[in-house]
Amino acid sequence: SEAAAIATPTATVTEDSGATGDSSDDGDDGEDSHATRHLLESVALEHYADKLRAAVEHSSQAIEDYGAKHREARGMGATVTAALVMDGQAFVANVGDSRTYLLRDGKIERLTRDHSLVERLVEAGQITPDEVYDHPSRNLIYRSLGAGHAAPEVDIFVEKLRPGDTLLLCSDGLWEMVRDPQLQQIITEHDDLKKACERLISAANDNGGEDNITAVLVRCLEA
């Protein structure tokens, strides 16, 4: 079992005054500055998302390379969910069925989408979300790092953060054992993130603990 807790100040996109060009007296300065700011923000968003995607792809290739050199590790795979918090935004990468949640104003919301058979069944209306937890095929995934997927398709989600927001990154060993209402309750009841992580892992073990359990909590503070 693994647990981690992080608190980070929320940041804002800053603008270099030299990037807006020369000033003029034609009354368009405000509009030009506003447009330039949006352009800078868009470029920054794409940059961070691309860097995060590249890091995940590099990790997948590293797993493939290791498997090629070690016969016992051939076909080895992994899932990943990762968050990069920059400029007041959370950039979340996901491959497989690990998850990232957002807790805001006491309510929990899943940001990621599982690359699993049961997720597709839910989307098709063939099973309910609650039936995922007991479905015999709940561990079948169609995307992973390694396992013959040197360049997996990486989902990237972007969420603008507010002070007080909390991100939970976790493996299926947590969310399959601790359902969303209990995740929400535990995180809400603990201001100390380390204690909240420990309680999440204890709850997963108390509920059966069928798999490895990883939980990471990240809380955004005032800048």
Question: What is the predicted function of each stretch?
Answer:
Residues S1-A223:
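PP2C/PPM-type serine/threonine phosphatase catalytic domain
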